[in-house]
Amino acid sequence: MQKMRILLIALCLGTLCGQVSYGGAGDRILLLGDSMMASNRGSGQSVAAVIEAAVGQDVSDRSVAGARYFYNLPITGKLGLRLTEQYQKGQWNWVVLNGGGNDLLFGCGCSKCAKMLDRLVSKDGLRGAIPSFIANIRKTGAKVIYVGYLRNPGVQSPIKACKPAGDELDRRLTRMARGDAGITFLPMSDLVPSGDRTFHQSDLIHPSVKGSRGIGARIAHVIKK
């Protein structure tokens, strides 16, 4: 059993979790999320790197590819596959995050997702795993930027069917943000032009370097305002 635990931890650290950056004393921006945030980290061209370059502040990037809100395995969950476990206490000015897409993809196959959507965030934006997590972050005084997902460029891909659920998630997150001036919902639904594959990697799921640049630039614009 102990060997299995060690193997799982090594697997997570080596493949699933990627490089987790722990913030130093001067860090004031914390980034959480799934593969949309974690992509291109190995080449130093992730969303966090784009934000750092644009605003001139270090970003503590704790995003983990595959992260979900509803994830039951205890060890890998603690290592960040449970999205809420990525949060690290600190004197953060900003907490930037995304999430919910893997819950829709793996929890309900991006179809018949009414119950999963309600678990993530209610129609009025007041209840659910996401508003609860954000409320706890806001209690620390940090401002929150919740980032929406890139959309499929209009071609066949494994996540093309996720658009209706993704659109509804965006609507609910917009309502959530309206209730608190310290929360910004930042959609990415209009970032990818129709037919343009260059914002995605070859799998048409994860952002390319160009996609990460576009996401990071929008986030940096909000921070610099």
Residue ranges of model-derived segments:
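Bacterial N-terminal signal peptides that target proteins for export
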Residues: 1-8
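Bacterial N-terminal signal peptides
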Residues: 8-16
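Boundary at the C-terminal end of the N-terminal hydrophobic targeting segment
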Residues: 18, 23-25
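Conserved SGNH/GDSL esterase-like catalytic core that processes O-acyl groups on lipids
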Residues: 26-31, 36-128
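Alpha-helical cap/lid subdomain in secreted, periplasmic
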Residues: 80-224
